[in-house]
Amino acid sequence: MEKQRLTAQLSSLRVPLFSVPWPGQCSNKAEVIEARMMKWADEHNLLVTDEYRNRVIRTRYGLLAARCYPNAGEELLQAIADCLVWFFLADDLFVDRVEVATDETIRNLTAMVDVLDLNVAGSPPVFGELAWLDVCQRLRRLLQAEAFERFAQGMRLWATTAALQILNHLRPTSVGMREYQTIRRHTSGMNPCTSLADAANKGSVQACEFYDADVQTLVRQTNNIVCWANDIQSLRIEIHQPGQFRNMVTIYAQQGQSLQDAVETTATRVNKEIASFCELADAVTARPISDELHGLIDGLKYWIRGYLDWVVHDTLRYADQFIESDADDRRF
């Protein structure tokens, strides 16, 4: 009933565009990185059918990496691109585009955590586990130990808060906005992504700067901007998913707003968060801070602008013409 009410309002839905006051960047290695990423995904058996391969080709995850980490060294950028294609596919096939919970859900998610904790794959490995192990071992080699642990902790929280997201979808109605924002902050995968922003620019930030309250606020604002914008941009396809579909927009609609009004309310929050991010970023960079921290803040800006540009210019992940074929992965 909830999905039917929302679906009935989709045909007239207007999706806003977002802008930020800094230019976009893109690595000049983008196409090479994309091609290698596809080859890597094929070698690790992530592209389960020709249909699925074609979907990944038009989604352009390598371009997302190139836009969000434009200054990264080629080896690190390749590892990040491979990580992104793995993450999107694992998130779709383990959580989002399948049944809310399956017999394999716990095994799949705990296997991902075990790779981080134990640095080995299980026997037999679950889908994507060997690819994930390969990505993690490359990042362990390329990053300082503490920097890798920031990434790893973000991924552990993705796997564990996925369970909270599943619980929310087993309820007849969604949890409230505060609880949703907590879940979204971690199931998005943004924290491990932003944890790589410093290494991809001027090197890893020392812990005393990385965990500064204002810096962590900037990281959280970056997460919010990307996640809440995505809640609007992915709305049409997510409503058709068999598993996860509740997000900020649908919660506002659950509270009584029309779907269009819920989109506008969410967009207003995105724009306010962008303004707050800009104000705080200017204040932090006006202080005497390290080059590495300057690089991290630049990296957060690259992520915000890079994601927004990827949606507008590169990817067909959320395109209307592929909703019918892409929203439901149970056949895979």
Swiss-Prot record:
Residue stretches in coiled coil: none
Pfam short name (any one): Terpene_syn_C_2
Keywords, alphabetical: Lyase, Magnesium, Metal-binding
Intervals of motif DDXXXD motif: 91-96
Gene Ontology MF term list: metal ion binding; terpene synthase activity
Site feature: Plays a critical role for substrate recognition: 92
UniProt-listed Enzyme Commission number(s): 4.2.3.163, 4.2.3.171
Gene Ontology annotations of biological process type: isoprenoid biosynthetic process
UniProt key word Metal-binding: yes
Entries under Gene3D superfamilies matching the protein: Farnesyl Diphosphate Synthase (1.10.600.10)
InterPro entries assigned: Isoprenoid_synthase_dom_sf, Terpene_cyclase-like_2
Site residues by UniProt (Plays a critical role in the stabilization of intermediate cation): 88
Amino acids binding Mg(2+) 2: 96
Catalytic activity: (2E,6E)-farnesyl diphosphate + H2O = (+)-corvol ether B + diphosphate; (2E,6E)-farnesyl diphosphate + H2O = (+)-corvol ether A + diphosphate
Residues that coordinate or bind substrate: 184
Record-listed Mg(2+) 1 binding positions: 91, 96
PANTHER family: BETA-PINACENE SYNTHASE-RELATED, TERPENE SYNTHASE
Membership in a protein family: Belongs to the terpene synthase family.
UniProt function note: Terpene synthase that catalyzes the conversion of (2E,6E)-farnesyl diphosphate (FPP) into sesquiterpenes which are important for fungi-environment interactions. Produces a mixture consisting of 8 sesquiterpenes including corvol ethers A and B, as well as traces of epizonarene, gamma-cadinene, delta-cadinene, alpha-cadinene, alpha-cadinol, and an unidentified sesquiterpene. The major product is corvol ether B.
Designated name of the protein: Sesquiterpene synthase MBR_10393
Organism per entry: Metarhizium brunneum (strain ARSEF 3297)
